[in-house]
UniProtKB/Swiss-Prot annotation:
Keyword Protein transport attached: no
Single GO MF descriptor: ATP binding
The protein's role, per its UniProt record: Catalyzes the reversible adenylation of nicotinate mononucleotide (NaMN) to nicotinic acid adenine dinucleotide (NaAD).
Catalytic reaction equation(s): nicotinate beta-D-ribonucleotide + ATP + H(+) = deamido-NAD(+) + diphosphate
Top enzyme category: transferase
One GO process term, biological-process aspect: NAD biosynthetic process
EC number(s) recorded for this UniProt protein: 2.7.7.18
Protein name: Probable nicotinate-nucleotide adenylyltransferase
Family designation: Belongs to the NadD family.
Gene3D superfamilies: HUPs
Keywords on record: ATP-binding, NAD, Nucleotide-binding, Nucleotidyltransferase, Pyridine nucleotide biosynthesis, Transferase
Metabolic or biological pathway, per its Swiss-Prot or TrEMBL entry: Cofactor biosynthesis; NAD(+) biosynthesis; deamido-NAD(+) from nicotinate D-ribonucleotide: step 1/1
UniProt xrefs under InterPro entries: Cyt_trans-like (IPR004821), NadD/NMNAT (IPR005248), Rossmann-like_a/b/a_fold (IPR014729)
Amino acid sequence: MNGIGARRIGLLGGTFNPVHNGHLRAALEVAEFMALDELRLIPSARPPHRDAPQASAEQRLAMVRLAVADEPRLTVDDRELQRDKPSYTVDTLESVRAELAADDQLFLLLGWDAFCGLPSWHRWQELLDHCHLLVLQRPDADSEAPEALRDLLAARSVSDPLSLAGPGGQISFIWQTPLAISATQIRHLLATGRSARFLLPDAVLAYIQAHDLYRAPNA
């Protein structure tokens, strides 16, 4: 059982290069379905698994802040941008958990591909010491978890995400509305002079245009 007054906090990390409506819709759906007190978007500074982003950390942070400005359930956490070393999720979880009460619930949101890649993450076996994992699945997803995760799923998975109990330690899957939007797609549109409107918030698009981001080098 959860303690009376225990908070429910969600975390969604990413490069957000740029943040788009796919990120935002997934975050809002989870915040509503799970009755979270807060869902924090956490921009990564130097993601260990990706090349350096095209926009600066400060620009990506500014875009995320603009994107969630009118949605009180979504907030921005910039702690990973304060680091001068690669952003490891386990470090972020430890840092957030240290700020919460012992019975507060912490939920880490992961896409299916990220979840399947967990065995390559730094100290990945420790993630559940700090949080529950909420794996976002699209209705059209049809794949199995890698063998390295099957024992973990057998021991820790819960069929109903609303029944996740305690501050952490379990895994559940949650359906999300399939929005075929990607940051790569948006960057390509902008680099080729085409419109990205309705794929991301107008305020974010205005910021991109004002700062001349994602333009082709010879544009």
